[in-house]
Amino acid sequence: MTTALKRGIFFAISNAEDYLHGAANIARLQLKQSSDVREVLNVIFKCACSEKKENPFYSHLLGAYCKNEGRRALFSLKVLAFELLEDNVGAMSEKEVHHSSCLLAHALIEEYLSFSVLKSMQTGEVSGSAKRRLQLCTIFDRIFKKASRDRLKHLINAAFSSFSAKDRSFEDLQQVLLDVCAALRLSLETDIKNVDAANRKKKSTEDRVGEALGPSPLTSLI
């Protein structure tokens, strides 16, 4: 954190007991300038991306901050999302791409962002960039897993209505959704196989224990 403002925001977040406390700490800093609001969002994203594993604290903090600040925060978040989806992803590690995408997904689910931000994607980049595919697959994977049924229906409709069918980005979006569905199906198949294997192992263990113990002495009384 290279400036006093960034350090102040960082300490407000890191000293919080929970995300509501964190949002209250940030509010106490009385940051009024639009550039200050943007800096808060930058620090939230940087802190989230620095974690070894994704921490939902930052998604909830982002939501609480946007709710408290209103339009200024929503506009700054939209600008930040445009940058992440436009050209900044190449300089990020895979962990940073994943964690930042989880934040964007949360913002989409809670309607702090609209799907129109996906239009900032470079045309054709999805098929040619592994990080861009990771970014979008993470966003939609999180939406499929976290959104309610009604919210999911609304989000999918909003996603496709944001694009023209003649737009190359529409084709990219279709491919991303197909990739996510395939990944979810593979995950489900793996879970089913694991459950089946566990059941077979349990039955095999029970059979071996039964053979070792032999017939119950009570059976001779029947």
Segments predicted by a language model, with ranges:
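Flexible helix-coil junctions and inter-repeat linker/turn elements that act as hinges
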Residues: 32, 50-54, 66-72, 90, ...
